[in-house]
Amino acid sequence: MNILKKLLWFVAAACVLFGCADDRMIYKPGSGSGNSGNGGGGEQPSGPGDYSKLTAANHPRIIMTEDDVMAIKTKLTAGTDANLKKLHECIMAYADKALTAKDLVYEVKGKRLLDVSTEAANRIISCSYAYRLTGEDKYLEKAEKDMQTVCAFKDWNSASHFLDWAEMAHGVGIGYDWLYDRLGDATKKSAEKAIQDYAFYCALNGKWNLNFYTSATNWNQVCNGGLVVAALAVYETCQDDARSIIDKAI
């Protein structure tokens, strides 16, 4: 996959996970009912997955690697790819806006923490990208601060609205992976614990109606996407749970 395609995938994923994550489930928690699509989108993967490269020495690894970062920098410097330039400027603009944004606060509206989760994920991902591309500490510091804030929340609202948790796990997972070599040990430990307690535990122990695994709504992409990103990010710290999450999603 070339660099432009990877960045386009990133932007598309952001649109799905952030822009389209509204409440479209047609069943209630614990009801056991719901829309369970039959798939049919192509061949299913077979055989055991290869997890051998998911080590502490191999970050960043989700969506883009360090080689991809260097290739993006080279293309941007050359100035020959107008589409890449526009995408880069769009992400950087969001990161710059995030630098002066107010601190995130645990605020549930109705049954949702979704607005906070969306803002957290957008900030963390855009600032993590900005740091990898520019090396400017202001982006690292902002992303790390927002990660620390949401990981100190009492929960990610998974008991009431699973989309909230999924977006939070996606943002923290990307921040953890892309900034791994620069995050403080306390921040990494906090992220690992939050992902385990607020995400994996809820999914693996049936704390929500788990029909999102086969649902034909946006809950499938958002919930499975957030779970898998988080599992890939912290795999080496909780291999059994992370592998269970990934295998079930696939």
Which residues are covered by each model-predicted region?
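Generic cytosolic/nucleocytoplasmic N-terminal low-complexity/intrinsically disordered segments
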Residues: 1-5, 27, 34-37, 141
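Aromatic-lined, polymer-binding surfaces characteristic
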Residues: 72-77, 83-92, 96-250
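N-terminal mature-domain "stem" immediately C-terminal to a signal peptide or N-terminal signal-anchor/transmembrane
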Residues: 47-93
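Detector for intrinsically disordered, low-structure N-terminal pre-sequences
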Residues: 10, 15, 25, 61-62, ...
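Short, motif-level signal for alpha-helix interfacial/capping segments enriched in acidic residues
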Residues: 42-45, 57, 112-116
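Sec-dependent bacterial lipoprotein signal peptides
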Residues: 1-18
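Short alpha-helical segments used as structural interaction elements across diverse proteins
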Residues: 2-3, 58, 70, 120
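Bacterial Sec-dependent N-terminal signal peptides
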Residues: 16-54
